[in-house]
Amino acid sequence: HETDSDGQVMNSMIEALTELQEMIVNLRYAFLTVHKARSFGSGSERLYVSNKEIKTFEPLKEICEEAGGHIPSPQLENQNKAFANVLERHNKAAYLVVGDSANFTNWAAGQPNEADGTCVKADTHGFWHSASCDEKLLVVCEFYFIL
């Protein structure tokens, strides 16, 4: 665009940029409000969501990644509780991932027991059990936002 002598094109671009900046601020505020409300309700910054499907471990991993999430990996007691609330609501167990250097664990009595399998599942009370990766369990994905 050629600028006229009064700089009207430049002024209109500055106005448009200012409007866009205001929209971004408003969208960020709306997003953070919804995120905080969901976190307040669950007690966790992480969000655990089920699509109600039943899958083995590998398809679950793909489903969660395609949705922009991950297989649940609770790092704190409140995260595990939020995860367990989803399982209790659906009355089903689900897979989770436990890191090698996990600071938080919630193994059930007698667990882990690799004879039961190399994957890990959580029951409706949030206790963790060794499991076969071929077991069909509730699909639950974990989402979290870092801003």
From Swiss-Prot:
Tissues with expression? Expressed by the liver.
Key words of the record: Calcium, Disulfide bond, Glycoprotein, Lectin, Phospholipase A2 inhibitor, Secreted
What intrachain disulfides are recorded? 64-141, 119-133
Which GO cellular component terms, listed alphabetically, does the Swiss-Prot or TrEMBL entry include? Answer: extracellular region
Domain of life, per the record?
Eukaryota
What one GO molecular function would you report for this record? phospholipase A2 inhibitor activity
- PROSITE patterns under this entry? C_TYPE_LECTIN_1, C_TYPE_LECTIN_2
Q: Which residues are glycosylated?
A: 103
* Secreted is among the record's keywords: yes
Tell where it localizes.
Secreted
Q: Does the keyword Manganese apply?
A: no
Pfam families on file:
Lectin_C (PF00059)
**Which residues does the UniProt record annotate as the domain C-type lectin?**
62-143
Quaternary arrangement and interactors, per the entry?
Homo- or heterotrimer; homotrimer of PLI-A chains, two PLI-A and one PLI-B chains, one PLI-A and two PLI-B chains, and homotrimer of PLI-B chains (with a ratio of 1:3:3:1).
Q: What family name appears in the similarity comment?
A: Belongs to the alpha-type phospholipase A2 inhibitor family.
Q: Give a short account of what the protein does.
A: PLI binds directly phospholipase A2 in the presence or absence of calcium. Inhibitory activity of the PLI-B homotrimer is less specific than that of the PLI-A homotrimer.
Q: Give the protein's recorded name.
A: Phospholipase A2 inhibitor subunit B
